[in-house]
Structures are given as C-alpha cells and as structure tokens.
C-alpha cells in the first residue's frame, strides 16, 4: 500500500481545503485531561499514517495557554532528528511524574496555615524546579524553530497588556523570537502560584527588548480565538500560504479546542455566601483562588460562546469541536493539588471524557449540553481521518512535498 511519509512537514493551506487549528486551555495540573485526549487523537493518526505520525504534522497552528502553552511547546519543539520532542502519548506520563515535584504538597501539621501565610506574602511555589525542568527539556530552541506555527499568550505586568508569542508575528518582529523555555515559563506564571518571569531578547543588530510576564490565562485562558485571529491577520495581509482563502471563510477553518475541566456542575459558591467575602476570601478559599478561577473560567467561556455562535451562524458547526468536562469536584478542580490520588482522578477523567457524548455550549444557559449521539472518542476518530486526508491532499498538490513512500 502507499502512504505519505509522516516525516514530511505539513504543506501550507493553499494546497489543501482546510486551515487546521488545535487549541489547549490553561489549568495547571488539569492539563492531564487534554493530555489524554491528545494521546488518543495521535494514536488514531498513527493507525492511519504510521507510528511516526505526530500532531505537529497535521495542524497549521497549535495554540496553548499556561499549562496548554507548555504542552504546545512540547508538541512542536524539534529534537535532534528534526521531529517533535514529545509524542502526545508521553505528555500524560510527564504530568504524572513531574507535577508532584512542580507543586510539592506539604502534609505536615499546620500545613494549611503555613500555605495561607505564604500565599499572602509571596507565590505559593518558588518555581525553581519547573524552570529547571523546562530549560532541560526545551533548551535554547526559539519560537522561530517550532515544527508548526504556535500561538502562546502571556501578560506583560509592567505595561498591563497581553504579549502574544506567535510564529506569524516573529517573522516581522525578531525581538519576539524568545526561547520556548522562556515563553513556557512565562505563560505558566499564574499569579499567587508561581513567580512572574523576566527575560530579554536581543536581535542580530544588538537591539534588545525586556519582558516582564505572567500567566497567559490573565489575557486568554482559551487561546482558540487568538489562533484564529493570527491566521485571519495572515490572510488579510495577503500571505501566499493561505491563498485563496478569505478572512471570514470560517467554513475552511477546522478547530479542535480542548478544555482542562471545571467545577460548574458542583455549584461551589452562591451570592449569599460570597456577599460577605473580603480580599482574603476572594484570594484564597478552600484550596482555591476564587477571583482568579472566576476570571479564567469567564475568559475560556467567552471564547467558547463566541466561536460557537460564529460557526453556528455560518452553518459550520461541525468545524468547531470543543471538548470540555464540567463535572470536576473537590481537589480535582484545583490547579495545583498534585497528589498521586488527584492526578489519577484527572487522568481517569480524561479517559471518561472520551466516552461522553459530544457537547456544545447552550448560548442561553452557558452550560454544555449533549449535541449528538456520538461520543468525543468517535468525533476524534472522524477528525483523525479528516486531518490525514487533508495532509495527503496537500502533499499531492504541493510541488515542495516529499514524494510518498511505499510500505
């Protein structure tokens, strides 16, 4: 049989029918949930195109915020052979092994009081192990060297504005060509949990730019809309990679957006309870940070509402796949309680989410509702087929693609 080599890079959308986008939300240790989903999708692509198939071979853009930004870097950074540094199947084990070291849990007497005092005087974790780990894995690889286009948001605490690290922008703004390590550390620097990150970038002419960054979730916890915006800007700018696609041609966009779970179904708080809260309760309550959780969830949901409405209005609902779990409870809804038991629960949540029906947000209630009889698992199997076909079409049409191989 004949099969396209999975080692050939993805040819630009101008040679295909679709613009393919993968987006991964922020959420700390809850990144385990999309890690499971991504592992399943990649395994389905491997069934179609061989064991060397990787997600970066199929998506024009991979966007990620916070923990999703770290996953994005891991999926797109090249190894010595010029292939993705991590297979998607390896990310789940990475979380299970490394999260307890990134977010060490104190089980000694009075640990709760100790954590409270520490959270009021500085970040809950010093981030040293996380920084060492990211530098060890990603090295000096720069944004311009990723194997497909990436979009990773951060927030500049000095200028109080978002700073978006985008493969598209770096072509014209070399002072944004930071290392993936610095970008991943920055987008993960969640206020109250991890320290802000400072670094400098210098170009070949000796010009320098300083960055003072915190978690990208402050700006866009769900980066799907950012990714679409970056592509739209490229199309509007006349990029040959996208001709003849039009900026508003959402029927040509294929978006997979992965959430990291939330506790909406738990209905954890109510107005009567929080009416008497002061600054302390909003910042730390029952192993959570309610004010930060509220902003992050609102940010993610607004993007989901917008994209659901737009794709529905353009009769392209099938082109927008949002996989999210609203049923987390207790410690599972936290971003940092990295006990073995809790991490196992999150991994199982990812497995169970695959078996759940495909859901879409109800634009009136804001809740996810079952939209089809098919499951997320079957939707991903179908998506793998579409992605594989799209890649093959581009390889056939492009004069730059490697010749197909026979096996």
Swiss-Prot record:
Task: Identify residues that carry Phosphoserine.
Answer: 398
Position of sequence motif GXSXG: 64-68
Q: Which residues form the PNPLA domain?
A: 22-228
Q: Which GO terms describe its molecular function?
A: identical protein binding; lipase activity
Record-annotated active site: 66, 215
Motif (GXGXXG) positions are: 26-31
Q: Where in the cell is it found?
A: Cytoplasm
What is the name of this protein? Patatin-like protein 2
Q: What is the lineage of its organism?
A: Eukaryota, Viridiplantae, Streptophyta, Embryophyta, Tracheophyta
